[in-house]
């Protein structure tokens, strides 16, 4: 009996202990499941909020300018032959923005909208400033790289007599062909276009040439824009002087009539000039200038006529 009672007690304790462990396991599983569900709900809410915020940005008035500012930064140091890739991505982004805008649902408070406006405006200013810094960086360092490349080419030519030409590699004169084997050893080029001494390609690659051409075009545009206002001012000044120096047709008719009447001695006296001032309404300086120019024109025509007459006599 005692053995049976002892065995039964052990079984009872075992049963009590086992029952308690099952309750703890189910409680832990429920807590973990609740935490996972809460995390999933929070992630879903955050994802939905991000989608709604993307829709707010897509319909914002500054959205197109922001995209243009981003693309402007990308275009600064992108080789010309790679620019179509940016255009293709830009076309895709346009469709994406339209999809965001199609699912737009206002959810921001007036205060949040003001904060979004301020953030986007500051972000666009940052991108514009960054683009200017990139342009300055590319211009300065591209010019330095080109100058350094020219110095290396000149040093190589001074040392070896080799002249680097685009597309043909190093060329030598016929007298130096015999020394070519000595140069092939240390100056041999690898299959990837880099020399084995570790100096890299001596001639600029297509991307480098494209970048150099881009920098040259940007500098040209910048110079034209810098001097544009000055050129327009000079042009306007020239046109103004031309308009100011051109006399009305009726006044020149009166002056020409006087000229034809006094063609033998086309030098008006002060009284003649005063009368012409009264008849034409011009200033004395304008009349003096017209007679000076008219005498020059007439002298030029007379000289041509006399030259033709002398040739005919011969």
Curated annotation (Swiss-Prot):
Its annotated compartments are: Nucleus
The reply to whether DNA-binding figures as a keyword in the UniProt entry is: yes
Tissue expression remark: Isoform 1 is expressed in roots and flowers, and at lower levels in leaf blades and leaf sheaths. Isoform 2 is expressed in roots and flowers.
Q: Where is the ELK domain?
A: 218-238
User: What are the alphabetically sorted keywords of the record?
Assistant: DNA-binding, Homeobox, Nucleus
Coiled-coil residue windows = none
Q: Which residues bind DNA?
A: 239-302
Q: Which GO terms describe its molecular function?
A: transcription cis-regulatory region binding
Q: Name one GO cellular component term.
A: nucleus
**Superkingdom assignment:** Eukaryota
Among its keywords, does the record have DNA-binding? yes
Q: Which GO terms describe its biological process?
A: mucilage biosynthetic process; mucilage extrusion from seed coat; negative regulation of DNA-templated transcription; regulation of secondary cell wall biogenesis; seed coat development; seed growth; xylem development
The similarity comment for this entry is:
Belongs to the TALE/KNOX homeobox family.
Output this protein's name.
Homeobox protein knotted-1-like 3
Record organism:
Oryza sativa subsp. japonica
Q: Give the gene that encodes this protein.
A: HOS66
